[in-house]
């Protein structure tokens, strides 16, 4: 079964053809450079550019896969969560294509896509722990199957990737923040500043994360956390912030490993491409799986892949399904199964 995946939840306009859930025939992405001068995503600009790009990326996905449009068996599209204007463009385009081609439509949750991304290039037996690190989400979960996912912990405020972007914006390190901070950190002293990390000891929050305190310390309290003789440079700020941001993740992950006795972890989302993070995770001495670097960030291959499995089990989505910008369960509710 050949699935056309469409992803437009934020600023990347993506389309892919994936066969039988894991064979990537094409994977096309257009990133919007127009946001760089604002040091962040401008939703109105993002949605407008999606309307210009979406037909092109779908055409290129079909051409690159060397198939005819009539060979598409299923259309999978991200319908939630994300920027509502961007989502509407993708969902409405997918609906129109579904009607025109008389092919079924399956609407996919963006987070389920990220959780599936490592399975595009790895065969991993369930259960395993999953960590999604992106600009919009920081989620620790237990996966019993592709559609049986229990949220253990989540950020109580900023997402990990969001904190990177905000620090980079404040110190004019460039956008997107994650890759630029990683590059600057290479030539910095990671111990120049002892920025705080937040660990929750209450039972109901033992797997949760928080980045607001670290962000505040890094932006407003540099002198307070500066070590003696350390210089205040962007390289040192980046290195020290990056170290604290990832140390923030380690204790909740260790607790989840101990409590579940699961020693397999997948990490996905844009932040998963960070090589410093990967070195830190190695110290956990467990099986760890990542998507390829180009599948860590938003992409349509992960949407097509999970779309194939969801369609086989649950059938097509209603053509009346609408885009949904927020899913409160991700932010506020733990123990919920997706």
Curated annotation (Swiss-Prot):
Major location category of this protein: cytoplasm
Reactions catalysed, as given in the entry: L-threonylcarbamoyladenylate + adenosine(37) in tRNA = N(6)-L-threonylcarbamoyladenosine(37) in tRNA + AMP + H(+)
Molecular function per GO: iron ion binding; N(6)-L-threonylcarbamoyladenine synthase activity
InterPro entries in alphabetical order: ATPase_NBD (IPR043129), Gcp-like_dom (IPR000905), KAE1/TsaD (IPR017861), Peptidase_M22_CS (IPR017860), TsaD (IPR022450)
CDD domains linked to this entry: ASKHA_NBD_TsaD_bac
Note describing how the cofactor binds: Binds 1 Fe(2+) ion per subunit.
Binding site for Fe cation: 110, 114, 298
Domain of life of the source: Bacteria
The protein's Enzyme Commission number: 2.3.1.234
The keyword Nucleus belongs to this UniProt entry's keyword annotation: no
Gene Ontology biological process terms from the UniProt entry: tRNA threonylcarbamoyladenosine modification
GO cellular component terms given for this protein: cytoplasm
Subcellular location: Cytoplasm
Cofactors demanded by this protein: Fe(2+)
UniProt: substrate binding residues: 132-136, 165, 178, 274
Alphabetical UniProt keywords: Acyltransferase, Cytoplasm, Iron, Metal-binding, Transferase, tRNA processing
Family, as annotated: Belongs to the KAE1 / TsaD family.
Function text: Required for the formation of a threonylcarbamoyl group on adenosine at position 37 (t(6)A37) in tRNAs that read codons beginning with adenine. Is involved in the transfer of the threonylcarbamoyl moiety of threonylcarbamoyl-AMP (TC-AMP) to the N6 group of A37, together with TsaE and TsaB. TsaD likely plays a direct catalytic role in this reaction.
Protein name per the record: tRNA N6-adenosine threonylcarbamoyltransferase
The species this protein was found in: Borrelia recurrentis (strain A1)
């Amino acid at each position: 079964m050949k699935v056309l995946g469409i992803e437009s939840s934020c600023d990347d306009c993506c389309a892919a053809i994936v066969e039988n859930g894991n064979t990537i025939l094409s994977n096309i992405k257009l990133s919007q450079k127009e946001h760089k001068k604002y040091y962040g995503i401008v939703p109105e600009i993002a949605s407008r550019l999606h309307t210009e790009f979406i037909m092109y990326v779908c055409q290129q996905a079909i051409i690159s896969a060397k198939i005819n449009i009539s060979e598409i068996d299923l259309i999978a599209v991200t319908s939630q969560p994300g920027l509502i204007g961007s989502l509407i463009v993708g969902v409405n385009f997918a609906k129109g294509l579904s009607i025109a081609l008389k092919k079924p439509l399956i609407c996919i949750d963006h987070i389920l896509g990220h959780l599936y991304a490592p399975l595009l290039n790895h065969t991993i037996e369930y259960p395993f722990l999953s960590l999604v690190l992106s600009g919009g989400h920081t989620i620790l979960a237990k996966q019993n199957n592709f559609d049986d996912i229990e949220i253990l912990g989540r950020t109580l405020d900023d997402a990990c990737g969001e904190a990177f972007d905000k620090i980079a914006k404040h110190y004019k390190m460039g956008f997107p923040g994650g890759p630029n901070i990683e590059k600057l950190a290479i030539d910095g002293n990671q111990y120049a500043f002892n920025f705080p990390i937040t660990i929750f000891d209450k039972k109901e929050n033992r797997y949760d994360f928080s980045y607001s305190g670290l962000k505040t310390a890094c932006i407003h309290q540099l002198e307070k956390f500066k070590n003696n003789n350390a210089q205040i440079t962007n390289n040192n700020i980046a290195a020290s912030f990056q170290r604290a941001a990832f140390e923030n993740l380690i204790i909740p992950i260790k607790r989840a490993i101990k409590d579940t006795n699961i020693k397999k972890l997948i990490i996905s989302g844009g932040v998963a491409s960070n090589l410093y993070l990967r070195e830190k995770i190695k110290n956990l001495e467990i099986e760890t799986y990542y998507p390829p670097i180009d599948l860590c960030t938003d992409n349509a291959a992960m949407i097509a892949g999970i779309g194939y499995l969801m369609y086989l089990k649950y059938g097509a989505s209603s053509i009346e399904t609408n885009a949904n910008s927020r899913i409160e369960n991700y932010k506020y509710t733990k123990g919920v199964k997706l």
